[in-house]
């Protein structure tokens, strides 16, 4: 099983993805670790990435599913804000990917981002991310979940939406 936990900064991607990987007995990866230094510096300076900046990174995210091997479920925390970004990830992956889209109100997102001290993404880029965000479309394999509830409840909702073990969905 290959899963991307997606959403804007502050939605809880890393926290939920880590808990989901633990619940499934799988591997957790954070797509932020796959950004190159130039992209990190650009975002830290408050400059939104362009599609050209994102393309190689999204390819690395898709390839990460393959390089994680056969370790069981692989869960990656990744913004994957637009449909075309998700399509780029799918194109590089060797198996179908389930997307768990996290949503939360802007005020709570901003509060969470402001409270972080160890992240390169400034609150100033939240509006840009919200403008860029495209919800999952009807033909995309996944689920949308609010992160207003506890991490345990959010993970439970995602697990409920996953297919039974051994079934494969195509996207």
Model-derived features with residue positions:
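Walker A (P-loop) ATP-phosphate-binding motif of ABC ATPase nucleotide-binding domains
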Residues: 2
């Amino acid at each position: 099983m290959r899963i991307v936990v997606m959403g804007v900064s502050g939605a809880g991607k890393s926290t939920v993805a880590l808990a989901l990987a633990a619940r499934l007995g799988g591997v957790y990866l954070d797509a932020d670790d796959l950004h190159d230094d130039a992209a990190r510096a650009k975002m830290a300076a408050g400059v939104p990435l362009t599609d050209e900046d994102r393309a190689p990174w999204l390819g690395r995210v898709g390839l990460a599913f393959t390089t994680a091997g056969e370790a069981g479920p692989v869960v990656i925390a990744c913004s994957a804000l637009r449909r075309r970004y998700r399509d780029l990830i799918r194109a590089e992956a060797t198996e179908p990917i389930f997307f768990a889209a996290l949503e939360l109100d802007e005020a709570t997102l901003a509060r969470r981002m402001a409270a972080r001290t160890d992240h390169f993404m400034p609150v100033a880029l939240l509006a840009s991310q919200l403008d860029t965000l495209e919800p999952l479309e009807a033909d995309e394999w996944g689920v949308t979940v609010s992160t207003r509830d506890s991490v345990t409840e959010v993970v439970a909702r995602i697990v409920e939406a996953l297919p039974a073990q051994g079934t494969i969905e195509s996207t």
